[in-house]
Amino acid sequence: MVYVDESGFSKHQPRTHGYSVKGKRCYGKHNWGEKGSTNVIGALLAGALLTVSLFETTINTDIFTAWIKQDLVPKLPQSSVVIMDNAAFHKNQSVKKALEQAGHILLFLPPYSPDLNEIEHKWGEAKSKRRKTQISILDLFPLPCL
């Protein structure tokens, strides 16, 4: 089974904890109005990232469909079962057609069940690592993944 999903990573990951003198509040500086994030689409196979792509734009139907056709399908093992959540652009007919023509099966998770999508845990681990180490997004997902 191959789990597919996307996630957004803020350009800057502010620390969630800090140190101060006992009894004094800890303050930090961060521009919360700052714009910009990197969107990531990835596929998880047997607990490891099969492929990851980074985008400096919003993920939409066209981008997701192109990623499926150009990146994911060529890397999938034969007769894979591809599992996605219910995002509107996941349910596009061209996505289904591309996977089925390549001999794969597409399944959708029940609505509002991110806990069933194993790649969600990988995104959580990546965001946690990024917060703790302040690692760049390019270093977080070195290419190639495998």
Listing of model-derived features with the role each one plays in the protein:
Residues 1-146:
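Short functional hotspots at interaction and active-site rims
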